[in-house]
Amino acid sequence: MINILTVKNMNNSCFKDLNVAFKENDFHLITGSNKCGKTTFIKLLAGIIESENAIFYKQRDISFLKSIEFSTLFGYFLYNGSFHFIFSNLDQEILHRLDYLDLSPSERKMKYKNLTQIFGLGEYLTNSISDLTIFQKIKASIMLELLHSPKILLLDQVFLELSEAQSKELISILRRIGGITVVATAQDLDLALEFDSLSIFNNGTLCVKNSPLDVLKEDSKLNKVGLSLPFMVDLSLKLKYYDLVDDVVLDIDRMVNELWK
């Protein structure tokens, strides 16, 4: 699998000699200590903050991509507690976005139908956006970013106000869509195992990047940046040390069964 996005020797006020790559069609999670630079990093990838000769889309410096080409490759939603809808309902929002895409009427209709169904928003399209829940607004915001079928979706802090069940549902929706590379940030490690890779930032540097399970086994590195293991992962690793379980067990019922064998 090829790297769709690569950061090479990034040096600025926030990062020093940062090197990291993201594989195509994988889901990548970035977390770390407070003020570790993860939100700034997403803004750099999204082109909100300029960066020259450091970020590459399939070996092409994104700073040289024309704005139209950049907007077709990237979609992003940075959650900061507020939303930026233009119209009073989702139906108008979607149709407005579709007006800017070079699609036939049948393609527009199909995209409208498919995305609203996948995101579970079909019955809320004519409701006032102000009446939607935070979860519905977050799903709607991300759905709008996917109307132009970007190759890369950048998400910052979208899980912050969601329950674990809502967060997992959102990740499941994005996986069902397929064909996109997701780079997302989170405050903690609770959702780490829902992703394909996990990167830990600290003070503008990359501490570790690997498969989530391998990173979660790096106790000393996680402790240095003040991150705590998810409860079931922590319990599994301790029990595995004493040969009470063979691997990480995330389901509590399965854990009980394993211990009673």
Predicted features, each with a name:
Residues 50-63, 70-72:
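Conserved ABC transporter NBD signature motif
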Residues 76, 80-82, 86-103:
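Q-loop/switch helix immediately C-terminal to the Walker
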Residues 46:
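Helix-to-loop junction immediately C-terminal to a conserved catalytic motif
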Residues 145-146:
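ABC ATPase C-loop
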Residues 128-132:
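Conserved ABC ATPase signature
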Residues 106-124:
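Conserved ABC ATPase "signature" region
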Residues 31-33:
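The feature captures the beta-strand-to-loop junction immediately N-terminal to the Walker
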Residues 205-232:
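Conserved beta-strand-loop-alpha-helix hinge in the C-terminal portion
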